């Protein structure tokens, strides 16, 4: 009998459930657990192969009749802002992002709840408790960080710290070839700031500064309004049967 090495991931398939993006479709996912000494390495390989991480699980769509979910990653080194993106970047120049270990706080959860209640009241995460949120942040065996965005204070140029209320948060995996944006949320009443766009732009700049070629955005579904923003950040690559292919929009 051949024994599977302990570090080799085992994969499982979920039962069919309603698709959250395309009405009338059923989704299934293949998933594995990210645990052990090789969790970082496995997460890198799986993300490069179209998987996403949620807590200590890596998953990707494995639907029987639909292939609409397409993995997207931005080519950070080649990216150029559009006029509108430059406006968003300038509009948020009073913000500063500070990197922290992946640890939850009551301040983060309060912002998270405000965001869900305003933007995703009927979504699958709408009933998450403070303990659920803590698990989302802490239950990880990979190189994960929290970036908290606040307004710049009088000493920010020295301390690199923001001042005042928490405005936005990004949960981000640091990979060998890029940054993977796992989840982000922000003050919902600041719509004029386009904070979701700003955080993606900030991650592109962070990837460039670290010499990392990619920013992973997860899945794009053509025809899904909630996913449409992802293809505005070009050039980017889409994962298909022939591997990662360049996409200019």
Curated annotation (Swiss-Prot):
One of its GO terms (cellular component) is cytoplasm. Transmembrane segments: none annotated. Its main location: cytoplasm. GO terms for molecular function: arginyl-tRNA--protein transferase activity; leucyl-tRNA--protein transferase activity. Keywords: Acyltransferase, Cytoplasm, Transferase. The keyword rRNA-binding does not apply. It is found in: Cytoplasm. Its EC number is 2.3.2.29. It comes from the Bacteria. GO terms for biological process: ubiquitin-dependent protein catabolic process via the N-end rule pathway. It catalyses: N-terminal L-glutamyl-[protein] + L-leucyl-tRNA(Leu) = N-terminal L-leucyl-L-glutamyl-[protein] + tRNA(Leu) + H(+); N-terminal L-aspartyl-[protein] + L-leucyl-tRNA(Leu) = N-terminal L-leucyl-L-aspartyl-[protein] + tRNA(Leu) + H(+). NCBIfam families: PRK01305.1-1, PRK01305.1-4, PRK01305.2-3. HAMAP family: Bpt. Functions in the N-end rule pathway of protein degradation where it conjugates Leu from its aminoacyl-tRNA to the N-termini of proteins containing an N-terminal aspartate or glutamate. Belongs to the R-transferase family. Bpt subfamily. This is Aspartate/glutamate leucyltransferase. It comes from Brucella abortus (strain 2308). The lineage of its organism: Bacteria, Pseudomonadati, Pseudomonadota, Alphaproteobacteria, Hyphomicrobiales.
């Amino acid at each position: 009998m051949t024994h599977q090495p302990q570090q080799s991931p085992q994969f499982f398939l979920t039962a069919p459930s309603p698709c959250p993006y395309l009405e009338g479709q059923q989704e299934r996912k293949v998933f594995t657990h990210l645990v052990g000494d090789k969790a970082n390495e496995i997460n890198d390989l799986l993300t490069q192969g179209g998987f996403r991480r949620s807590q200590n699980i890596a998953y990707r769509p494995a639907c029987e009749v639909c292939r609409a979910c397409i993995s997207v990653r931005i080519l950070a080194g080649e990216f150029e802002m559009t006029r509108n993106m430059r406006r968003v970047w300038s509009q948020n120049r009073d913000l500063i992002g500070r990197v922290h270990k992946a640890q939850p706080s009551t301040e983060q959860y309060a912002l998270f709840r405000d965001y869900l209640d305003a933007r995703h009241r009927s979504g699958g995460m709408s009933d998450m408790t403070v303990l659920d949120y803590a698990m989302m942040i802490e239950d990880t065996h990979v190189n994960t960080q929290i970036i908290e965005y606040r307004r710049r204070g009088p000493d920010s140029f020295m301390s690199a710290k923001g001042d005042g209320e928490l405005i936005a948060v990004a949960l981000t995996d640091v990979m060998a070839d890029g940054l993977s944006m796992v989840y982000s949320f922000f003050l919902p009443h600041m719509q004029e700031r386009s904070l979701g766009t700003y955080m993606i732009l900030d991650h592109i700049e962070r990837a460039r500064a670290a010499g990392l070629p990619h920013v992973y955005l997860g899945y794009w579904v053509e025809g899904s309004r909630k996913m449409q923003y992802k293809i505005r950040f070009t050039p980017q690559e889409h994962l298909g049967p022939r591997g990662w292919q360049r996409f200019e929009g």
